[in-house]
Regions:
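Alpha-helix termini
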Residues: 10, 64, 82-83, 108-113, ...
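Alpha-helical elements of Rossmann-like donor-binding domains used by nucleotide-donor carbohydrate transfer enzymes
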Residues: 42, 77-80, 84, 114-122
Length: 123
């Protein structure tokens, strides 16, 4: 009986610890206007593609190059590259839906084929 009480107490302790850790790390979303004031720059543009507001930049002239970021990033991943490339190329950088200043997908689908379709519609 004593051993089962210890196990029960340990389970309750672990569960409460997890709840405290999880709730302590919850943060509110930063309002879009605050994000725009920090991350929008003179090259920033917005266009609606397939019902999604997409943040992109279009700089330079010449053969176009499209730069796409990875998971958890934005078009700013390419800031240093774009600075050099735009001297000889037209550089388009896109923030994919659900990241940075681009809006979310209303259907909440974020698969590769969805990004390919969005890119196809964008160009």
């Amino acid at each position: 009986m004593f051993k089962s009480k210890q196990i029960f107490t340990a389970i309750i302790f672990v569960a409460l610890s997890l709840v405290i850790l999880i709730t302590a790390n919850i943060t509110k979303d930063i309002p879009l206007k605050d994000l725009k004031s920090e991350f929008k720059n003179e090259s920033s543009r917005f266009v609606e593609v397939d019902g999604i507001l997409v943040h992109y930049t279009d700089e330079g002239e010449g053969t176009p190059i499209i730069l796409l970021h990875g998971t958890g990033a934005s078009l700013h991943t390419w800031d240093l590259w774009a600075e050099k490339l735009k001297e000889n190329y037209r550089v388009l950088r896109i923030t994919l839906p659900g990241f940075g200043l681009s809006g979310p997908r209303l259907d909440k689908r974020y698969e590769i084929k969805d990004y390919v379709n969005l890119l196809d519609s964008f160009v």
